[in-house]
């Protein structure tokens, strides 16, 4: 009888601890609490991440990452058509020969007359494959 009581008490303690550990990844998770009322333009975002209620946040949301790292993430409703279009556009790789949005193309020379090194934030879009011989 005492063994059954101990087992029941242990089960109760474990059941109470589970909600505290779920959704915890060792750090505080920022959750979006409400959606933006305005459409977010493509030109100000560099990417996005998804927020799921199953991870402890109150609402499902898409959090758009602003180009300026000092700005807060922008929350949007994943069911809105413009949000899905913006996500698709961000998922597309840049066209060959085009720079990613917000990347300034090296114009050849700087004001001092020396060749510039280009922007460190720009990614190369073309990659060459080594030939097999």
UniProtKB/Swiss-Prot annotation:
Disulfide bonds join 31-57, 32-75, 103-122. Residues 104-122 have a biased composition (Basic residues). Residues 87-133 are annotated as: Disordered. InterPro entries: Chemokine_b/g/d, Chemokine_IL8-like_dom, Interleukin_8-like_sf. GO terms for biological process: immune response; inflammatory response; leukocyte chemotaxis; negative regulation of myeloid cell differentiation. One of its GO terms (cellular component) is extracellular space. Pfam families: IL8. Expressed strongly in lung, spleen, thymus, peripheral and mesentric lymph nodes. Also expressed in the testis, kidney, liver, and heart. GO terms for molecular function: chemokine activity. It is found in: Secreted. Residues 1-23 form the signal peptide. Residues 98-133 are annotated as: C-terminal basic extension. Keywords: Chemotaxis, Cytokine, Disulfide bond, Inflammatory response, Secreted, Signal. The keyword Secreted applies. Binds to CCR7 and to CXCR3. Interacts with PDPN; relocalizes PDPN to the basolateral membrane. Interacts with GPR174. Inhibits hemopoiesis and stimulates chemotaxis. Chemotactic in vitro for thymocytes and activated T-cells, but not for B-cells, macrophages, or neutrophils. Potent mesangial cell chemoattractant. Shows preferential activity towards naive T-cells. May play a role in mediating homing of lymphocytes to secondary lymphoid organs. Belongs to the intercrine beta (chemokine CC) family. Three genes code for Ccl21 in mouse. Ccl21b and Ccl21c produce identical proteins while the protein produced by Ccl21a differs at only one position. Ccl21b and Ccl21c have Leu-65 (6Ckine-Leu) while Ccl21a has 'Ser-65' (6Ckine-Ser). This is C-C motif chemokine 21b. The gene is Ccl21b.
């Amino acid at each position: 009888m005492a063994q059954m009581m101990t087992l029941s008490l242990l089960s109760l303690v474990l059941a109470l601890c589970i909600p505290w550990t779920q959704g915890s990844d060792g750090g505080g998770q920022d959750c979006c609490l409400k959606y933006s009322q305005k459409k977010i333009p493509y030109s100000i975002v560099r990417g996005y991440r998804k927020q799921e209620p199953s991870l402890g946040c109150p609402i499902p949301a898409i959090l758009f990452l602003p180009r300026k790292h000092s700005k807060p993430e922008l929350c949007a409703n994943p069911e809105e058509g413009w949000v899905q279009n913006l996500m698709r556009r961000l998922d597309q790789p840049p066209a060959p020969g085009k720079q990613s949005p917000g990347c300034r193309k090296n114009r050849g020379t700087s004001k001092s007359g020396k060749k510039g090194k280009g922007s460190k934030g720009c990614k190369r879009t073309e990659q060459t494959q080594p030939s097999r011989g």
